Amino acid sequence: MIMKTYFSGVSTLGVHSLATEDYGFFPLSVDQKTMERMKNVLDIPATQLNISNSSLIGSLCVGNSNGLLVPDITTEKEVELIKMFLKENSLDVNLERLKAKNTAFGNLILTNNKGCIISEELSRFRKTIEDVLDVESGVGNYAELATVGSNGVATDKGCLVHPLTDELELEWIQNILRVDYVERGTANRGVTSVGACILANSKGAVVGGDTSGPEILKIEEALDLID
């Protein structure tokens, strides 16, 4: 199932939210009706919060069913809210505050429950990232971009990446994430940073409201969401 929506008129949903196979985080500005629809499409419990007093949840955080990485600038109150949410939903998730110069973990890491791709900019933290997310990783960039997280969206079934990703990079991504499908595509009528525009897991996807019909078809194919 795929849903189109905006967050307060903004279509870059992946910048402001995080979705995994088992939980989701959304900005405080999202109305309850939209929240419930997204939870239904993705079939996950979710809560609304800030990270580092910011709505840029998807840019700053990265997570899967095993772990969640947040920047060291995340406040104590925000960490406690996350812990409470995880406990209330009986989710056994490793929560790690990582101190790094570049705090945009969501932009620099692409992960599912089988593997993760780490930007060269975070290569020194590879062991910590692997331990928290409990997956093996590959370090590198693709499409000549360091922002491997914001330029891709991955689930346990498939992955959609920047349209300039080459064939060797597609094979590399597929091997690391251990998915059946890796496709190139766009969202929001030509935006190449697909991770900034899409929230997805193996059960559904929520895409920016500007996403076209042909783009939705490609997203469905890449993430194996066609019924």
UniProtKB/Swiss-Prot annotation:
Gene Ontology molecular function, alphabetical: ribosome binding; translation initiation factor activity
Keyword vocabulary terms for this entry: Initiation factor, Protein biosynthesis
InterPro entries, A to Z: eIF6 (IPR002769)
Entries under SMART domains matching the protein: eIF6
The organism's place on the tree of life at top rank: Archaea
Annotated protein name in UniProt: Translation initiation factor 6
Function: Binds to the 50S ribosomal subunit and prevents its association with the 30S ribosomal subunit to form the 70S initiation complex.
Family: Belongs to the eIF-6 family.
Pfam families referenced in this protein's UniProt entry, alphabetically: eIF-6
Entry annotated with the keyword Protein biosynthesis: yes
Record-level GO BP terms: cytosolic ribosome assembly
Signal peptide coordinates: none
